Amino acid sequence: MAHELSKTILITKVTELIAEEYRISISQARDMLFDSEIINLIDNDETGLYGESPLYVFSLFQEKHKI
C-alpha cells in the first residue's frame, strides 16, 4: 500500500486526460482506465509507474488501446 497518494493523483490525472482526449465523461474514462492493464501496472510498486508523469502513463494507455 505504499505510494497510495501518488497513485491516486496519477489515476485522477490520467482519467482526466482520457476524458478530454476521447470526449467522454469522467466516469466513462475511469471505467476505461480500470478495465485496462495499465491500472495493474500503476498499482504494482515494482514497476515504478506510479512515479511517472500523467502524460507518460496516458501515452501508454493510448498505445495499448489504439483507439
Which sequence ranges carry the predicted segments?
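C-terminal alpha-helical interaction appendages
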Residues: 1-67
